[in-house]
């Protein structure tokens, strides 16, 4: 693995990546990564990396995002360890050929799906969950038998340093590499032909990555974002809703792609929800949230300035304070927000929660459906029928009724977007499937040629009728 913490630059040569990428491709062509033994060894080493370097990872996440140990464990380290354990436990089963049914014409043949690796995979991770969103895709890529290039975000520089310097010590350096750099280097890296690209980030950059992939017809997964709606029905307990919404809105200082971006509720519910949210924020972070060890910080000055600008939208009902020196934005609730204001036109990605009033469930659903399909959608109600209505009449990458992003802790559920919020799914076996080519295989008998006479010329109406029956579903039913 490379590159020992150095950022390759274009002026150091015509192409700083070409030689290393060629070596990785050659390593894949040896078949080294395809064996179950190799895959298991690499997964075990990845697990050791997480265990051995827990303190370094926690310190890096704290340095980058002011992330508490609790949040780092819950949203980064533990989930990665769970994915490694799950892959190791199920690797042999996932790798097995999958038998499929045949028709009468192929009854003496063997049909199956073989899961084979794509080859050289590029994983580009963002800064907001820099361990989780790098390691979990890596688990799937290793389990599927690929060679991998990892591109961590240069914005979360402390975590980038840990990944670049320590992870190479645990994985086979002939098959895996960490490559560093900013937008210029990433753009140059994307000029190369990969066999699969996995990108997590903004829709704007996702379009750039997809355009680069299209030049080589490279398959791609895009894990993007968007404005995730949260509908709160009148028939619910405001304090329960406030507790759950405040926790996952302000988790990681709101820098979470599946966090609720705005609440839709009636005017009556808003009047109850605002004091309930204030109560939850005070209980979670104290009278002065700036001094709380449980509230993170904005990643950098650029994002801080952007969020500070959004505080001028609508009317501040809770919070609104900021400190540029600490990159601190207080947990904030906005009311009287207009649809045309910037806070409702872009993904917030910070600890700001606008409340938008609607007159009915139908109006709320219409509001959601007039916008791009989100990565996540939430609904709160004591009436199960209301939850069912929201689920049935909307579309999103993920949905949760009466809770936040707890579904993200389940490897049994696929994670991903739809439309502008992304394409493709991963987590658990879905990660293995994403990084595997589902190869359709049919092994026929080399003899018994007379049985094939039906399909050879000269054709006749009788043969056509028999062929239709032999290929059709009725023949399988009769047998």
UniProtKB/Swiss-Prot annotation:
GO terms for biological process: aldehyde metabolic process. It is found in: Cell membrane. A lipid is attached at residue 476 (S-geranylgeranyl cysteine). Geranylgeranylation is important for membrane localization and enzyme activity. The active site is at residues 223, 257. Residues 477-479 form a propeptide. Pfam families: Aldedh. Its EC number is 1.2.1.3. Keywords: Cell membrane, Lipoprotein, Membrane, NAD, Oxidoreductase, Prenylation. Gene3D superfamilies: Aldehyde Dehydrogenase, Chain A, domain 1 (3.40.605.10), Aldehyde Dehydrogenase, Chain A, domain 2 (3.40.309.10). GO terms for molecular function: aldehyde dehydrogenase (NAD+) activity. GO terms for cellular component: cytoplasm; plasma membrane. Expressed in testis, kidney, small intestine, spleen, white adipose tissue, liver and lung. It catalyses: an aldehyde + NAD(+) + H2O = a carboxylate + NADH + 2 H(+); hexadecanoate + NADH + 2 H(+) = hexadecanal + NAD(+) + H2O; octanal + NAD(+) + H2O = octanoate + NADH + 2 H(+). It is a lipid-anchor. It comes from the Eukaryota. Its main location: membrane. Belongs to the aldehyde dehydrogenase family. PANTHER family: ALDEHYDE DEHYDROGENASE, ALDEHYDE DEHYDROGENASE FAMILY 3 MEMBER B3. Oxidizes medium and long chain aldehydes into non-toxic fatty acids. This is Aldehyde dehydrogenase family 3 member B3. It comes from Mus musculus (Mouse).
């Amino acid at each position: 693995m490379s590159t020992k913490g150095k950022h390759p630059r274009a002026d150091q040569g015509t192409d700083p990546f070409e030689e290393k990428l060629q070596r990785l491709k050659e390593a894949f062509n040896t078949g080294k990564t395809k064996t179950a033994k190799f895959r298991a060894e690499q997964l075990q080493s990845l697990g050791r990396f997480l265990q051995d370097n827990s303190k370094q990872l926690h310190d890096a996440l704290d340095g980058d995002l002011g992330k508490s140990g609790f949040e780092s464990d819950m949203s980064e380290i533990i989930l990665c360890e769970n994915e490694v354990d799950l892959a190791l436990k199920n690797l042999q089963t996932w790798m097995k050929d999958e038998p499929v049914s045949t028709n009468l014409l192929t009854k003496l043949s063997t049909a199956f799906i073989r899961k084979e690796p794509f080859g050289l995979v590029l994983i580009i991770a963002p800064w907001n969950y820099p361990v989780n969103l790098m390691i979990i895709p890596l688990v799937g890529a290793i389990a599927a038998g690929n060679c991998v290039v990892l591109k961590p975000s240069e914005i979360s520089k402390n975590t980038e340093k840990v990944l670049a310097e320590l992870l190479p010590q645990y994985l086979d350096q002939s098959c895996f590499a960490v490559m560093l750099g900013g937008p210029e280097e990433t753009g140059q890296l994307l000029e190369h032909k990969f066999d699969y690209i996995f990108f997590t980030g903004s829709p704007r950059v996702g379009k750039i990555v997809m355009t680069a992939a299209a030049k080589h017809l490279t398959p791609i997964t895009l894990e993007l974002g968007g404005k995730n709606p949260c509908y709160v029905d009148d028939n619910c307990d405001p304090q329960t809703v406030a507790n759950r919404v405040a926790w996952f809105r302000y988790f990681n200082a709101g820098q979470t792609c599946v966090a609720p971006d705005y609440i839709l509720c009636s005017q009556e519910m808003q009047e109850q929800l605002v004091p309930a949210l204030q109560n939850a924020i005070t209980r979670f972070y104290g009278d002065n949230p700036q001094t709380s060890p449980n509230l993170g910080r904005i990643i950098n000055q650029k994002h801080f300035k952007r969020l500070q600008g959004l505080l001028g939208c609508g009317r501040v009902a809770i919070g609104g304070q900021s400190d540029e020196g600490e990159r601190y934005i207080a947990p904030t609730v906005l009311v009287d927000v207009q649809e045309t204001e910037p806070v409702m036109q872009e993904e917030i990605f910070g600890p700001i929660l606008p409340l938008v009033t609607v007159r009915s469930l139908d109006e709320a659903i219409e509001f959601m459906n007039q916008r791009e399909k989100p990565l996540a959608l939430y609904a709160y109600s004591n009436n199960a029928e209301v939850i069912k209505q929201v689920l049935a009449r909307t579309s999103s990458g993920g949905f949760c009724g009466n809770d936040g992003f707890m579904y993200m802790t389940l490897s049994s559920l696929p994670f991903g977007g739809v439309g502008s919020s992304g394409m493709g799914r991963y987590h658990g076996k879905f990660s293995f499937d994403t990084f595997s080519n589902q190869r359709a295989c049919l092994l026929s008998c080399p003899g018994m040629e007379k049985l094939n006479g039906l399909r050879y010329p000269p054709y006749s109406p009788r043969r056509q009728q028999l062929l239709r029956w032999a290929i059709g579903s009725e023949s399988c039913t009769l047998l």
